[in-house]
């Protein structure tokens, strides 16, 4: 890596591999053509092939837009998904869609009702996301295509269809890890070199309300974090050296609202010194996220911390000097060379999207790039 001097006069390295100094979590506001096409498909007025053609056109457009504004990383915006997690999880062997009595509770609102049910042995034999990634790979050009998928830990929240299906929790987590190990290999063979696991499960340990949810699901909030970490580490254990795997740790993101609050403190050591990943995307866009003290648990020099200091929930641009000041605060705990910048979450974790315009979305991403260029120049 070539050395450069940043605005504070410190020597930093130009980031040539993922995660990048200016990165983003992945999901983007669904375009009007995609929304209209999905509605027509649901109404029986459009075939699956016609819908895919429109998705392909719009994904190509947003990939070009990401490159045009200066990003080194591109995603498909999750344009083929309704949810950031359910669509992918339903494609695993042994998992089926399920409509519960009500949606997920967020701050002052609820999502539409949707969940998953585990009906048999978990496995990964084939998956529609493979074709989705291959399309992104083909159109990425000289940018790095990033695939975003839910963490295996999200399967913990799936209902069991019948008694007798995974009564043994150890077997359940073992099979989660093995299914994901196969998935990682399949995506690698398809050309993927930058994979992101999205995970809201950790936020349950940030506050008492979440820990009660864990207990209601039959888990122990004292021991479950270590089990979650082992599952992740087992899943990624055999990854090739040239595959970058990061994790985005999220507190919920639905129509500009949130589901959880609290800092990382209760599980900071497990997350920051216990996960064998290449990078962590951490939300830090408001007071609900806590302070930077947990970053003291970052012991590895090869772990990149992507600071989510730019909110994806609203269109107003942050004061760049305030963002730079916060990056410098984080650098008290972690070397500036190990830090990157991104929005705190995606712009549309579900197809409804957050409450900002597409132009505001692109302005936010340009803002990330401009600030990163100033800090790590």
UniProtKB/Swiss-Prot annotation:
| Location of the region described as Disordered in the Swiss-Prot/TrEMBL record | 1-25
Query: What terms describe the molecular function in GO for this protein?
Result: 5-methyltetrahydropteroyltriglutamate-homocysteine S-methyltransferase activity; zinc ion binding
What highest taxon heads this organism's lineage? Answer: Bacteria
Spell out the Basic and acidic residues composition-biased ranges.
11-24
- Kindly give the Gene3D superfamilies that the UniProt entry links to this protein: 3.20.20.210
Q: Which GO terms describe its biological process?
A: methionine biosynthetic process
Which Pfam families does this UniProt record tie to the protein?
Meth_synt_2
**What protein family does this chain belong to?**
To B.subtilis YxjG.
Protein name as it appears in the record: Uncharacterized protein YxjH
> In which organism is this protein found?
Bacillus subtilis (strain 168)
Q: What is the lineage of its organism?
A: Bacteria, Bacillati, Bacillota, Bacilli, Bacillales
